[in-house]
Amino acid sequence: MARDEVRRILPADIKREVLIKDENAETNPDWGFPPEKRPIEMHIQFGVINLDKPPGPTSHEVVAWIKKILNLEKAGHGGTLDPKVSGVLPVALEKATRVVQALLPAGKEYVALMHLHGDVPEDKIIQVMKEFEGEIIQRPPLRSAVKRRLRTRKVYYIEVLEIEGRDVLFRVGVEAGTYIRSLIHHIGLALGVGAHMSELRRTRSGPFKEDETLITLHDLVDYYYFWKEDGIEEYFRKAIQPMEKAVEHLPKVWIKDSAVAAVTHGADLAVPGIAKLHAGIKRGDLVAIMTLKDELVALGKAMMTSQEMLEKTKGIAVDVEKVFMPRDWYPKLWEKRDRS
């Protein structure tokens, strides 16, 4: 039967308007390391792998393998996948490890195979499943590692792809922390026949998708070997995304060169340091602080709205929580001002 077209929109897909605060702000090309110009060793230190996790190992095991393969000290993944589940698993490396926090508000997408325990007409299946869009209440499954408290989660969209007998293949976009196994169980209850999850694959984690950046562990081993043994870095470089990829979806504040070193040395972002910003920022929002070369400086909590940042001349605009840029990429311009 024909299916209605579903608008598959996650929070990561929101388009934002850029507001100019200082139209005269410029950046010095001699300072910093834009993502596309980082040497390969630096690219690794500030990189994220869009990994196609195979079914079988745990997410923790996969990260441990990557650390061993690439001889790394630190790495972290952006959202656990159960051992049997395959698909998109962003793995942040070394100094970019903490950037996975930025993926929490971005939303995730899965393709799941649901098996019904009884016969149900196709139109009823589609109708009932659409009723699960919006806010739902879940309790984590028994096998979950987290406490089994009731929690509210958002289902952004459900799209039925195929129905064959009692098997239903569907795509679903959800808030981070949503349990698809529990969702399927409750769909089965609503249909009056019961249901369980047969297969599950994650197809998106915010800005990370099933696209040309998605690589397997086998690819990673091969590309690393080409670089280390043959000196061919092209494939290995493409296998690792800059950490800036992980904040594509966040509201951003771009800062002047003169403010960069202050932030990297622990200062919160003050209004005079802002060159431009995204519209729609609300107090409390997680925002990415960027240079005018689109380098990630830090993540922080907005202390003002976009309009306040635009109109005010002083005050703290962003409470800086995590700094990613090294302190020596931009000069301490405030020291020059102090000496002059």
From Swiss-Prot:
It comes from the Archaea. One of its GO terms (biological process) is mRNA pseudouridine synthesis. It catalyses: uridine(55) in tRNA = pseudouridine(55) in tRNA. InterPro entries: Dyskerin-like, PsdUridine_synth_cat_dom_sf, PsdUridine_synth_N, PUA, PUA-like_sf, PUA_sf, tRNA_PsdUridine_synth_B_fam, TruB_arch. The keyword Transcription does not apply. Its EC number is 5.4.99.25. Pfam families: DKCLD (PF08068), PUA (PF01472), TruB_C_2 (PF16198), TruB_N (PF01509). The active site is at 82 (nucleophile). Keywords: Isomerase, tRNA processing. GO terms for molecular function: RNA binding; tRNA pseudouridine(55) synthase activity. The keyword Metal-binding does not apply. Residues 250-325 form the PUA domain. PANTHER family: CENTROMERE/MICROTUBULE BINDING PROTEIN CBF5, H_ACA RIBONUCLEOPROTEIN COMPLEX SUBUNIT DKC1. Could be responsible for synthesis of pseudouridine from uracil-55 in the psi GC loop of transfer RNAs. Belongs to the pseudouridine synthase TruB family. Type 2 subfamily. NCBIfam families: CBF5 (TIGR00425), PRK04270.1 (NF003280), unchar_dom_2 (TIGR00451). This is Probable tRNA pseudouridine synthase B. The lineage of its organism: Archaea, Methanobacteriati, Methanobacteriota, Thermococci, Thermococcales.
